[in-house]
């Protein structure tokens, strides 16, 4: 690698709100999005909620000259909705589906059927290895009564672990997507603390766009006040996060968002605002010991957020086990009822009534059995994430007590930040 190596990486991210039969003006919005991406000529365009593979193929054909490489990440019954368009050849592709993703009986929310996931693409840019990730986490739906909070924390941890373990050979790491979390939310803090990723909005030298970088704003005609909840001025739930891993320094020169409409018309691309970032990457000479400046103060934030996350997962585990136990009792009660009905059916007097009641009783047992199995699986998934956090927390606490060997993510972050 040349000592004077540098490059600029222009990135586009958007939650497209492309739901067949439900989203408004899909065809027009996809057409305008394709025109805009061709005009701007980004290095990477990472999209979420493209839940129509036909629309992806439309964009792929429309963008083929500007973005010759593209990929659609498939998962679940409906699909992950994730896709990428790249001006540069994609060397490797991998997808990880989150193990916890809501509840199948909350069908009106639909997250469980989508197979929410994270997609990884590896690019080589003049010798530099870039790991780019695109993801979409579980929606919140209600700030006051968030029944999916534990699932979203578990997803954030799973995402952080995935990045942590797959980015060790990368020079630069980029994560874009709809995290469905506010900047100070537990899952967002957990993700940034464990991976060492920087928030482009916080770090940028030049920001232009909506107030406070909000990516859902009231002036967008597709956004209702119900979507914003207790935040009438807007919410920031879409992110561009980045870091340097090896002998590089990366910073966000510019960050722009749309402000309720696309830059070339008075209509929005989506109910979310688009993010457009320019990252500047340059070679940074290696330091003798990039970890010597790291101490207990830097580690304490990670320890604190891990403890809080484990507590929240514990509450989720207790809830999942309660539902599993309740459905278990229902199964026992239903089976007992079936035995009684079979006895009654053997007689002459109540045979017809018993046979009729057997049908809903069998249905009750089957439904309760499905609920039992699902919540047992949910409890195990939350326990797994909690156990992984405990392992990291124990190591970090011991290291803090010794006052040495800071965690790997922070060391890599510090090394990348040294210019």
Swiss-Prot record:
Tissue expression per record: Although widely expressed in all tissues examined, except the spleen, high enzymatic activity occurs only in the brain.
Annotated site residues (Important for substrate recognition) in this chain: 180
Residue numbers binding Mg(2+): 49
EC number(s) reported in the record: 3.1.4.12
Catalytic center residues: 272 (proton acceptor)
Keyword annotations from UniProtKB, A to Z: Cell membrane, Hydrolase, Lipid metabolism, Magnesium, Membrane, Metal-binding, Sphingolipid metabolism, Transmembrane, Transmembrane helix
Residue spans crossing the bilayer: 326-346, 354-374
Pathway linked to the protein: Lipid metabolism; sphingolipid metabolism
InterPro entries attached to this UniProt entry: Endo/exonu/phosph_ase_sf, Endo/exonuclease/phosphatase, Sph/SMPD2-like
GO annotation terms (biological process): ceramide biosynthetic process; ceramide metabolic process; intracellular signal transduction; positive regulation of apoptotic process; response to mechanical stimulus; sphingomyelin catabolic process
Reactions mediated catalytically: a sphingomyelin + H2O = phosphocholine + an N-acylsphing-4-enine + H(+); an N-(acyl)-sphingosylphosphocholine + H2O = an N-acyl-sphingoid base + phosphocholine + H(+); 1-O-octadecyl-sn-glycero-3-phosphocholine + H2O = 1-O-octadecyl-sn-glycerol + phosphocholine + H(+); 1-hexadecanoyl-sn-glycero-3-phosphocholine + H2O = 1-hexadecanoyl-sn-glycerol + phosphocholine + H(+)
Gene inactivation effect: Mice lacking Smpd2 and Smpd3 are completely devoid of neutral SMase activity but do not developed sphingomyelin storage abnormalities.
GO cellular component: caveola; plasma membrane
Lipid bilayer topology: Multi-pass membrane protein
UniProt GO molecular function: metal ion binding; sphingomyelin phosphodiesterase activity
Compartments where found: Cell membrane
Required cofactor names: Mg(2+)
Activity control summary: Activated by arachidonic acid.
Source organism, top-level taxon: Eukaryota
Pfam families: Exo_endo_phos
pH-activity note: Optimum pH is 6.5-7.5.
Family: Belongs to the neutral sphingomyelinase family.
Functional summary from the UniProt entry: Catalyzes, at least in vitro, the hydrolysis of sphingomyelin to form ceramide and phosphocholine. Also hydrolyzes 1-O-alkyl-2-lyso-sn-glycero-3-phosphocholine (lyso-platelet-activating factor) in vivo. Also acts on 1-acyl-2-lyso-sn-glycero-3-phosphocholine (lyso-PC) and sphingosylphosphocholine.
This protein's name: Sphingomyelin phosphodiesterase 2
């Amino acid at each position: 690698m040349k000592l004077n190596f540098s490059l600029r990486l222009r990135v586009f991210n958007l939650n497209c709100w492309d739901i067949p039969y439900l989203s408004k003006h899909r065809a027009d919005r996809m057409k305008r999005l394709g025109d805009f991406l061709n005009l701007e000529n980004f290095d990477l365009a990472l999209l979420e909620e493209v839940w129509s593979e036909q629309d992806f193929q439309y964009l792929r054909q429309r963008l083929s000259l500007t973005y010759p490489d593209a990929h659609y990440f498939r998962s679940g019954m409906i699909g992950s909705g994730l896709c990428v368009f790249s001006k540069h050849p994609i060397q490797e592709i991998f997808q990880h589906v989150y193990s916890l993703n809501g509840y199948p009986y909350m069908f009106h929310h639909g997250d469980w059927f989508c197979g929410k996931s994270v997609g990884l693409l590896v690019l080589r840019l003049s010798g530099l290895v870039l790991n780019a990730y695109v993801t979409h986490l579980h929606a919140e739906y209600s700030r006051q009564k968030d029944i999916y909070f534990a699932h979203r924390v578990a997803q954030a941890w799973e995402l952080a672990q995935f990045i942590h373990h797959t980015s060790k050979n990368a020079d630069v790491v980029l994560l874009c997507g709809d995290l469905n979390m506010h900047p100070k939310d537990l899952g967002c803090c957990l993700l940034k603390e464990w991976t060492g990723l920087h928030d482009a909005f916080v770090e940028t030298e030049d920001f232009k766009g909506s107030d406070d970088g909000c990516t859902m704003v009231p002036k967008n005609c597709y956004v209702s006040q119900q979507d914003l909840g207790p935040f009438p001025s807007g919410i920031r739930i879409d992110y561009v996060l980045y870091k340097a891993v090896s002998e590089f320094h990366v910073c966000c020169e510019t960050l722009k968002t749309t402000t309720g409409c696309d830059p070339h018309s008075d209509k929005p691309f989506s109910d979310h605002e688009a993010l457009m970032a320019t990252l500047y990457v340059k070679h940074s000479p290696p330091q003798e010991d990039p970890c010597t400046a790291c101490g207990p103060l830097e580690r304490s934030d990670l320890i604190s957020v891990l403890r809080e996350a484990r507590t929240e997962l514990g509450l989720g585990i207790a809830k999942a086990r309660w539902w599993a136990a309740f459905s278990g009792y229902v199964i026992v009660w239903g089976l007992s009822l079936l035995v009684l009905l079979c006895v009654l059916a053997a007689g002459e007097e109540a045979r017809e009534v018993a046979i009729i009641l057997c049908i809903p009783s069998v249905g009750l047992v089957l439904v309760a059995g499905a609920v039992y199995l699902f919540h047992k699986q949910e409890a195990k998934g939350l326990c797994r994430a909690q156990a992984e956090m405990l392992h990291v927390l124990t190591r970090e606490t011991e290291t803090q007590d010794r006052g040495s060997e800071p965690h790997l993510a922070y060391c890599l972050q510090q090394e990348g930040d040294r210019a």
